[in-house]
């Protein structure tokens, strides 16, 4: 590869821990790649000229980690960032893997699950800001239904709005230099996901308490699933 095309940090390419660390598993078979720790991934990205690394909370800290384990993982990750010069531009929350979210996170019919989703997101925001994130992505992969009778769509929209309002107020109260980006997808893992397109999110954002703090994160493959493009 000529120097002209060699990747450099100033090109601002960033990668998710969940992409580089993917074990090569699909629904029909077991993992096919060796495990890479978050620290390993940061050093690998540093070697190939990446600018930064992004993560879901549980990509970095396992959901069942003890407080002591959490602190050690974050300490080691910070050292890897310092050693390589990589940045953390964006962070997000895994609101889809825990079985508690089978009916949704912010839109769940169970108020205990909705409270858990908010608590998990606030802790993940704290972690993201601690590591330098300026953008916080919200992807509602479980916010939807398999059948319309499962959930009141209008009530679900209100719950989602209340959650975003709560989180923007939390960010302001904590004086975080943080903006939110809403990521759309029409389906998967739910059969029908609420607010399935970037356009629907643009309309939704205008109904929030602090629309100036919220934007969109168009994901190429998700847009194509809706028959859209950039």
Predicted features, each with a name:
Residues 15, 55, 138, 182, ...:
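Conserved beta-strand positions
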Residues 52-77, 140-141:
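Glycine-rich, proline-tolerant flexible connector loops at the mouths of alpha/beta enzymes
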Residues 72-93, 97-215, 225:
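Active-site acidic/histidine proton-transfer and metal-coordination neighborhood
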Residues 226-230:
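Histidine/acidic-residue-rich catalytic or RNA/ligand-binding cores of hydrolases
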Residues 33-61, 123, 132:
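Catalytic domains of carbohydrate-active enzymes, especially glycoside hydrolases
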Residues 16-25:
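Short polar catalytic/cofactor-binding loops
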Residues 1-17:
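N-terminal amphipathic alpha-helix/helix-capping segment at the start of soluble metabolic enzymes
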Residues 33-40, 44, 65-79:
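Aromatic- and glycine-enriched glycan-recognition loops and surfaces
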């Amino acid at each position: 590869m000529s120097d002209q095309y060699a990747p450099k940090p100033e090109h601002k390419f960033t990668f998710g821990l969940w992409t580089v660390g993917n074990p090569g598993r699909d629904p029909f078979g077991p993992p096919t790649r060796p495990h890479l720790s978050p620290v390993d991934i940061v050093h690998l990205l540093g070697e190939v000229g990446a600018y930064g690394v992004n993560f879901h909370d549980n990509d970095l800290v396992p959901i069942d980690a003890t407080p002591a384990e959490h602190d050690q993982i974050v300490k080691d990750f910070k050292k890897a960032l310092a050693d390589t010069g990589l940045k953390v531009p964006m962070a997000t929350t895994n609101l889809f893997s825990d079985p508690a979210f089978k009916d949704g996170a912010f839109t769940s019919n169970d108020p205990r699950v909705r409270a858990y989703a908010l608590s998990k997101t606030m802790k993940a925001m704290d972690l993201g800001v601690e590591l330098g994130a300026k953008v916080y992505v919200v992807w509602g992969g479980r916010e939807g239904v398999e059948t319309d009778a499962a959930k009141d769509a209008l009530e679900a929209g209100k719950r989602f709005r209340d959650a975003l309002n709560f989180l923007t107020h939390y960010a302001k109260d904590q004086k975080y230099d943080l903006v939110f980006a809403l990521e759309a997808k029409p389906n998967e893992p739910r059969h029908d996901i609420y607010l399935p397109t970037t356009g629907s999110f643009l309309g939704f954002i205008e109904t929030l308490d602090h629309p100036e703090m919220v934007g969109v994160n168009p994901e190429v493959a998700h847009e194509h699933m809706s028959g859209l493009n950039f």
